[in-house]
Amino acid sequence: MEKLKRFLPEDQYEKLAAINNPYLHEFLAEWIEWLKPSKVFVCTDSPEDEEYVRWKALYYGEEKMLEMPRHTVHYDNYYDQARDKANTKLLVPKGVTLPFLNTMDREEGLKEIREIMKGIMKGKELFICFFVLGPRNSIFTIPAVQLTDSAYVAHSEFLLYRKGYEEFKRLGPTKNFLKFVHSAGELDERKTSKNLDKRRIYIDLVDETVYSANTQYGGNTIGLKKLAFRLTIQRAVREGWLSEHMFLMRVNGPNGRKTYFTGAYPSMCGKTSTAMIPWENIVGDDLVFIKNVDGTARAVNVEIGVFGIIEGINEKDDPIIWQVLHSPVEIIFSNVLVKDGKPYWNGMGIEIPDEGENHSGKWWRGKRDKEGNEIPPSHKNARFTVRLEAFPNLDKEALENPCGVEVGGMIFGGRDPDTWPPVREAFDWEHGVITMGASLESETTAATLGKEGVRAFNPMSILDFLSVHLGDYIRNYLEFGRKLKKKPKIFAVNYFLRENGKWLNEKLDKAVWLKWMELRVHGDVEAIETPIGYIPKYEDLRELFKQVLNKEYKKEDYEKQFKIRVPELLAKIDRIWNIYEPIGNIPEELFKQLEEERERLLKAREKYGDYISPFSLL
């Protein structure tokens, strides 16, 4: 405490002295001394402290005001527009190897990051902010402290997370908190990070601390988002619960019944559009904690806000988000085009001006970057940051419930043109975890990999954020379900089937799949048993299409969508098997489930041929 007293003005020192936690004080003293900020501000939970951060984001030029009240815009460096996978490393003890993951020797990594961060905040203001992941004062709560010299990062976290200063006071001398140290580093004249060659995001799994330097892009800097996620996955696997990359939503059943679903979808597979279906309710769009509470799986949204991709959001397809983005609620737009104080983005469905300011500085149509690429009006990864309370379809009670909500179903959403049917239900927990969650793939489009139709393996949509061995992660999933008295049903969906180049489903058909899943959770409708799980009966879907979309659902459409495509399904089993086999430390159950599914498909092929009509299986 003596050190802190030396570094801080009295009013800021008193805020820290009110927290009885020597571990926290020691950590803060060490880093304030190392970073050498010219000024330190400690954020409590008061609205005044939040307002101070908001004002500082404008004062330091990291954000600018827009025409609509409470809207601001932030720009990242032209070359700092996405998660930096190459320089995001998990620091692990010598000799530890984790397949698929970018690891580095811990001692080496700590030495390098300390060197980069030495005195990096000279002439800058350090903000010390306290937050919690999950609701406060609950079995889900994980406290976290963020050190940053970016008022934009601190402001973003106030929109995305619950404040945690009082929680730190309540908890007293605990070591059980996550730590984040961030510096944007030296800034250029546009107030964006300059030294991108020294951009580093190092995640210390031993000390549960994340260091991030010379970057501002949210995915690299907003500590509590995907950086904390790596730490909570490790914790969940160690302690026997689930920390997942999933939405949490309420599907409204007959007679006012409320059923909650979680959903894991790789990007471009329909995650946001599912969570935002207009007549259902959202609890969260990105991260959930799921715990066993008295034998039941209960889930909470880790966050209270949305850090969403804005590209393509338009009034017709995304009426709810569109309404929020045009309301005078607090929103930070990032890396969009601004003209006359109004934000514009690619694919918004209205005319975009031919000039303005964007992530490249002064912009005009046809402008090219130094590599000769044409610069679009907004970056494809441009974002909006807003609190969930701005959404009219928010289930506020579920968001704030410290006990979480009971999970009725878990959905895994893949993307392929010719393999998975639009919706199906697993036979049981193990079957769902392995053949749906652990087998998740998404077909990439030509734009991302230069090759149409490459299937990217992404189990549980978590591969980019994994911090433990994949085998341990899957083993924990299986164990978690086995200990539940009441298991959620597991479903898989695929909105992207094609035939002769044409989509087999329309965008809103997913609303019907949700209603069917809700009915199945409660055993209200029967289903057809197939080699890959249960699929809906035609009559039930016909009725739901009429009820939900006021649309006639034709028998031939049902047959095309739900036929069992044996050759493609067998090819997928081989692909998944060949990915897991060389890894080692994979649960035996995975190969057992894949083998059983293969046998069921081969048996069905003998009887019905390569492509099986759902009507043959009645």
From Swiss-Prot:
Cofactor note: Binds 1 Mn(2+) ion per subunit.
Amino acids binding Mn(2+): K226, H245, D286
Binding site for GTP: M268, C269, G270, K271, T272, S273, R383, R415
Catalytic residue list: C269
The reaction(s) this protein catalyses: oxaloacetate + GTP = phosphoenolpyruvate + GDP + CO2
Residues binding substrate: R83, Y217, G218, G219, S267, N381, A382, R383
GO molecular function terms attached to this record: GTP binding; manganese ion binding; phosphoenolpyruvate carboxykinase (GTP) activity
Annotated pathway: Carbohydrate biosynthesis; gluconeogenesis
Domain of life, source organism: Archaea
Described function: Catalyzes the conversion of oxaloacetate (OAA) to phosphoenolpyruvate (PEP), the rate-limiting step in the metabolic pathway that produces glucose from lactate and other precursors derived from the citric acid cycle.
Name listed for the protein in its UniProt record: Phosphoenolpyruvate carboxykinase [GTP]
Species of origin: Pyrococcus abyssi (strain GE5 / Orsay)
Lineage of producing organism: Archaea, Methanobacteriati, Methanobacteriota, Thermococci, Thermococcales
